[in-house]
Amino acid sequence: MCCNYYRNCCGGCGYGSGWSSGCGYGCGYGCGYGSGCRYGSGYGTGCGYGCGYGSGCGYGCGYSSSCCGYRPLCYRRCYSSCY
């Protein structure tokens, strides 16, 4: 689960789950402020936006629900540093 700095949390990725839900791109920044995650997780091998570019999961991981819905390994990798 990831939270943004507004402490909005969710357990997956999705195109529409950005700043308002704490997933996706917003999570990259939110992890450092409200959820106890490391700031760097947003762009490394952590959660949200960073997953699409830095974790080897593939671009779609940061935006498509299919990443988290159908690729559990990718899902865990995206969010493994967000607890």
Curated annotation (Swiss-Prot):
Top-level lineage group: Eukaryota
Gene Ontology CC: cytosol; intermediate filament
InterPro entries with a match to the protein in the record: KRTAP_type8/19/20/21/22
Keyword line: Keratin, Repeat
Pfam family for this entry, one: KRTAP
Described purpose of this protein according to its UniProt entry: In the hair cortex, hair keratin intermediate filaments are embedded in an interfilamentous matrix, consisting of hair keratin-associated proteins (KRTAP), which are essential for the formation of a rigid and resistant hair shaft through their extensive disulfide bond cross-linking with abundant cysteine residues of hair keratins. The matrix proteins include the high-sulfur and high-glycine-tyrosine keratins.
Quaternary structure (record): Interacts with hair keratins.
Record-given protein name: Keratin-associated protein 21-2
